[in-house]
Amino acid sequence: MSRPVRRSPRELTESWPDMPAVDPSGEVARRFAENLRKAMDGRSHRATAELTGVNYSTIQSILSGRAWPDLYTIAKLEAGLNAPLWPGLLRSDE
């Protein structure tokens, strides 16, 4: 039995990353990407990759909403950028 295909984060919002996602998982991914972009502080994808040890194409995929970051990637990005990126618990009133 095959696994169902998981939609990408960008498919869970009308306009990535500008519009909030109705799906809570998509909204966490969108906010994570926003936090990552802010923490990059103008650095290029390649400079961020060198700093964090995360492949630049993975960084591009997260920022464009094409990929779901895994825990290993999240930890490497947060450590390398010395910034909290995970948006935390989203409440239904947000």
What does each model-identified segment do?
Residues 46-49, 59-60, 80:
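A generic structural signal for ordered secondary structure
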Residues 34, 38, 61, 76-79, ...:
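DNA-binding alpha-helical recognition surfaces that contact promoter or target DNA
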Residues 45, 56, 71-74:
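Helix-turn-helix DNA-binding elements, focusing on the entry/boundary residues of the two helices
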Residues 72-87:
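DNA major-groove recognition helix of helix-turn-helix/homeodomain DNA-binding modules
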Residues 55, 92-93:
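Positions that flank functional sites
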Residues 2-45, 51, 86-89:
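A short, Lys/Arg-rich alpha-helix, primarily the initiator
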Residues 53-69:
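Recognition helix of helix-turn-helix/homeodomain-like DNA-binding domains
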